[in-house]
Structures are given as C-alpha cells and as structure tokens.
Amino acid sequence: MKQVSDASFEEDVLKADGPNXVDFWAEWCGPCRQXAPALEELATALGDKVTVAKINIDENPQTPSKYGVRGIPTLMIFKDGQVAATKIGALPKTKLFEWVEASV
C-alpha cells in the first residue's frame, strides 16, 4: 500500500495510470486502525485493478481540506484525476471489496 502526502498527491494519485482508492485516516482514529488490515488485503487482492493509497490527515491537512473530508475514515476512488466515488466510515471487508470493485 502506498503512503501519499500533500506534496506527492498530484503525482501519485491524480496523474497516476488507472484508478486509485485513497484512505484518508489518522493515527488516533479507532475505526481507521480497525479497517487497516482489510485495506492491506484489498491492495494485495485487487492490486492489478486499483492502487490503494493512504494519506494521514494530521500530517497532510491540505489534501483532505481540498476534497472536503469531514470525517474519517473516508475512502475516495480517483479516476483520471477526478473523484469517482466516496465512502465515509469504516466498512466490513466484504462491503469494502464490493464497493471498490463496483467503483473501479
């Protein structure tokens, strides 16, 4: 899973080939930590269809502000430099996989 920052977001996500699922998270967020293993599995299982990235909102406040992230965890699918889908809140693994597969 790729770690991105405010400085690398444009290059790593917006200009990337193929879709990206970006997890907006924070160290202090319990639901974020709970879902991390499912995101790791997603990155491995669907790595040929989507790149999974994480951005820590405390260390990188500009990007979540730009995309209107109000609660975490927030997952966004980016395609061709645009937000294609957004999901706020933790999802069970099966729902996460279904949502990402339907969105990419």
Swiss-Prot record:
The keyword Disulfide bond applies. The keyword Disulfide bond applies. Disulfide bonds join C29-C32. InterPro entries: Thioredoxin, Thioredoxin-like_sf, Thioredoxin_domain. Keywords: Disulfide bond, Electron transport, Redox-active center, Transport. GO terms for biological process: cell redox homeostasis. One of its GO terms (cellular component) is cytosol. One of its GO terms (molecular function) is protein-disulfide reductase activity. It comes from the Bacteria. Residues 2-104 form the Thioredoxin domain. Belongs to the thioredoxin family. Participates in various redox reactions through the reversible oxidation of its active center dithiol to a disulfide and catalyzes dithiol-disulfide exchange reactions. This is Thioredoxin. It comes from Rhodospirillum rubrum. The lineage of its organism: Bacteria, Pseudomonadati, Pseudomonadota, Alphaproteobacteria, Rhodospirillales.
